[in-house]
Amino acid sequence: MSACRSFAVAICILEISILTAQYTTSYDPELTESSGSASHIDCRMSPWSEWSQCDPCLRQMFRSRSIEVFGQFNGKRCTDAVGDRRQCVPTEPCEDAEDDCGNDFQCSTGRCIKMRLRCNGDNDCGDFSDEDDCESEPRPPCRDRVVEESELARTAGYGINILGMDPLSTPFDNEFYNGLCNRDRDGNTLTYYRRPWNVASLIYETKGEKNFRTEHYEEQIEAFKSIIQEKTSNFNAAISLKFTPTETNKAEQCCEETASSISLHGKGSFRFSYSKNETYQLFLSYSSKKEKMFLHVKGEIHLGRFVMRNRDVVLTTTFVDDIKALPTTYEKGEYFAFLETYGTHYSSSGSLGGLYELIYVLDKASMKRKGVELKDIKRCLGYHLDVSLAFSEISVGAEFNKDDCVKRGEGRAVNITSENLIDDVVSLIRGGTRKYAFELKEKLLRGTVIDVTDFVNWASSINDAPVLISQKLSPIYNLVPVKMKNAHLKKQNLERAIEDYINEFSVRKCHTCQNGGTVILMDGKCLCACPFKFEGIACEISKQKISEGLPALEFPNEK
């Protein structure tokens, strides 16, 4: 796309939250029972069920099991599948419905399209089989009108997983145009984009507010809740998070290169990753034995709004085939695998753009000792300034000056970026190109401070790689084609599967933490977020006793 550097005047929201570390999560795989901690609990699963009957059309049989207790207190986490399958020889004939397109054209993929869509230059079948054996030159629907394909339109309708995981694929074929040339004009770039059939409306608008907001959290668990709020508030879920697929066969291959988990290795064994699992665990791992402060910087850019068509949508061939491959009897593992591939819900409408979110881990004790205040940190990083995205260039306010990182007073000068006042930076960025992601990671690997200019660089790339930043959700089972054989049964099974999925990976299967600690379930392992006066993997250790002379325990960060 050529529009990544061409924005109209836009105003971004920068939210700055001060997350004071009055809560700390203390979990450590190195800690043993000999140190006086709680006894470790390994993942425990129920026995396998009996094998199902052989499905005559799928030629497979299935079995399942349940998670009884999640790993906790340095025990083994639950990472194994709850479903299993194997090939079989059916004893009954398959009564599978044959694809019949009637008077329409049947693609090699099995899709049925209108005959008028043949030989028009568009890939209406998804494999260009509708463009084979044409007797004359294609008749493009847009003729000589100049249009471009839109990344915003491709992203429209993308789903979410109720437990926070990024779906591996989208159900919508947003490169199908149904022979139409519906064009939408981006007022920022003056470019016309062709709107796919599935998208009922797409409005390009780069907007926001020039606004700074500061929030203060007395407990770190409340700060953590604020970070994951958008992933749980819509469903009133407890703190149960699952970022790694366990049921999908191709999960390992699919997930290694997703935008949310690209890795970059530096010298030695240090590894930086955008994996949500690692990111959240990194945030939770900071101990409050050294008083910490968390500077939460958040900026959103909205590029456009969309509404999906509510009927006659065109789904990808893969999505339709995967629905057909679901057994008509309810098999938990198979339906969970489907949910982990496509999400539990899809977006019927929403906003597209990017979310720039960083958490700076600040050493509060060092700041006090060296006379550095929070406003000095913000001024050094440039987050006290307004940011403008202009048509020809992207810039920050003229006041941004690297000299602001040196604070002078009482006969001394403190360089904020080199005095170990900023311990770490945790990235929760969504959207933007892979090129920018690698550039940012390289800076973090080198220990270079990330400031407002990095926000500007990121903003220039989100048109090429937008993400959903707000959405109205609909259950994925609403997309089951009504004319498909056994559609009603499979829709019922998917509805049941979503409920079972939430209950299967529930924090209720964790043991309680001691002394008022809060339990967090993350990727098959239960963690304890401890009140300020306690620490340990179960919040079992009183810091008051440590201060009275008992040996202190160390809690190195989990890698």
Curated annotation (Swiss-Prot):
Domain TSP type-1, chain residue ranges per copy: 42-95
Residue ranges constituting the EGF-like domain according to the UniProt record: 510-540
Gene3D superfamilies: Laminin, Low-density Lipoprotein Receptor, Thrombospondin type-1 (TSP1) repeat
PTM characteristics: Thrombin cleaves factor C9 to produce C9a and C9b. Phosphorylation sites are present in the extracellular medium.
Major localisation: secreted
Function: Pore-forming component of the membrane attack complex (MAC), a multiprotein complex activated by the complement cascade, which inserts into a target cell membrane and forms a pore, leading to target cell membrane rupture and cell lysis. The MAC is initiated by proteolytic cleavage of C5 into complement C5b in response to the classical, alternative, lectin and GZMK complement pathways. The complement pathways consist in a cascade of proteins that leads to phagocytosis and breakdown of pathogens and signaling that strengthens the adaptive immune system.
Protein name in the entry: Complement component C9
Species: Homo sapiens (Human)
Lineage of the organism: Eukaryota, Metazoa, Chordata, Craniata, Vertebrata
